[in-house]
Amino acid sequence: MPEISRFYGIVIRLYYRDHPPAHFHAIYGEHEALVEIETGTVNRGWIPKTALELVNQWRMIHLQELREDWSRARQQMPILPITPLD
């Protein structure tokens, strides 16, 4: 599962050919959440509230890039890294 970004101890990953809806995996320590790209909703798992707020700030800034990477991953094309949250 390629890592597409890392910031404040949070790792963002995408799986190739993963199931809909479009989402990414946010890992913080021992916690992991599946976060919908379009809405920021956590579909499965859990990460602390502060980490989730940072993830959603980053998600909103990079929404189009996330959509494009999701499409690439579904087609098994190379996934591009995304700039971390400053």
Positions of the model-derived regions?
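Basic nucleic-acid-binding interfaces
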Residues: M1-D86
